[in-house]
Amino acid sequence: MDQEQTPHSPTRHSRSPPSSASGSTSAEPVRSRWSPKPEQILILESIFHSGMVNPPKEETVRIRKMLEKFGAVGDANVFYWFQNRRSRSRRRQRQLQAAAAAADATTNTCDQTMMVSNSLPHHSGSDLGFGGCSTSSNYLFASSSSSYGGGCDNQSNSGMENLLTMSGQMSYHEATHHHYQNHSSNVTSILCPSDQNSNFQYQQGAITVFINGVPTEVTRGGIDMKATFGEDLVLVHSSGVPLPTDEFGFLMHSLQHGEAYFLVPRQT
C-alpha cells in the first residue's frame, strides 16, 4: 500500500510555474534575480502588445528558446515576466482612468464657477440703498446758493440740482459695476487656475512615452538621439521596428504619445 501512494504525493504542487524543457534545476534559480536584456525586453513587449498576455506552457517554452539567444533564461522567468507585465498594465489603466476622472471633475468645477460669477447681480447706487445721495446733493447745492446771495431763480436752481444728482448716481454706478467685474474675474482666476496651465504642456508639444517601461516626457517632433541618449543606442518601437534617424542624428519621425519604445545597443 505504501508503494501505491508514493507516486501521488507530488500532485499537490501542480500549480507551480512551468519548468525548463531540459528538466535541469540549474536554470530555475535565475528567475529570482533575472534582469532581462534590452533585446529580450523587446521580444517580450512585442509579444505582449500583439495580444498574447498570458501564453500557455507550449508558447512559454517557445518564447524562452527565442530569448536564450541573448542570454540565460528559464521558463519560470518568462512566466513571471508576463504575470508582472499584466499587473503593471492594469495598474497603469487604473491610473489613466483616475486622471481622466480628476480632469472631468476640475472641468465641471470651473464651469460651475463661471456660472456663479456670471450670475452675480450688478446693482446701481439706488438699488443698494444710496438713493439719499440726491437729497444730500440738493440740500448742499441749495444751501450754497442761498449763502452766496441767491442770485439765481428757482428754475435754474432746480436744473443744477438735477444735474448734480444725475452725475453722482452715474459715478457711483460705474464704480460699483467695476468692483463687481473685478470680483467676478478674481473668483474665476482663483478657483480655476489650471485652465491656462493645463494647455501649456500641450502648446509646448510635450508628450509622454514609455522607454524601457519607464514613463518619460519628450518633446513632439524630431529628437536629437546623440545628445539625448548617446551615440551607441538605437530607439526601437515595441513592434520591433527601429526608428530611422537622419545624417545629423535626429529622429525622422515624432514619437507617438503613450507608445512603448526600447533603447538597444547599436549593431556594429
UniProtKB/Swiss-Prot annotation:
Keywords: Developmental protein, DNA-binding, Homeobox, Nucleus, Transcription, Transcription regulation. Residues 29-93 bind DNA. Transmembrane segments: none annotated. One of its GO terms (molecular function) is DNA-binding transcription factor activity. One of its GO terms (cellular component) is nucleus. Residues 16-27 have a biased composition (Low complexity). It is found in: Nucleus. Pfam families: Homeodomain. Disulfide bonds: none annotated. The keyword Endoplasmic reticulum does not apply. Residues 1-35 are annotated as: Disordered. GO terms for biological process: adventitious root development. InterPro entries: HD, Homeodomain-like_sf, WOX11-like. The keyword Nucleus applies. Belongs to the WUS homeobox family. Transcription factor which may be involved in developmental processes. This is WUSCHEL-related homeobox 11. It comes from Arabidopsis thaliana (Mouse-ear cress). The gene is WOX11.
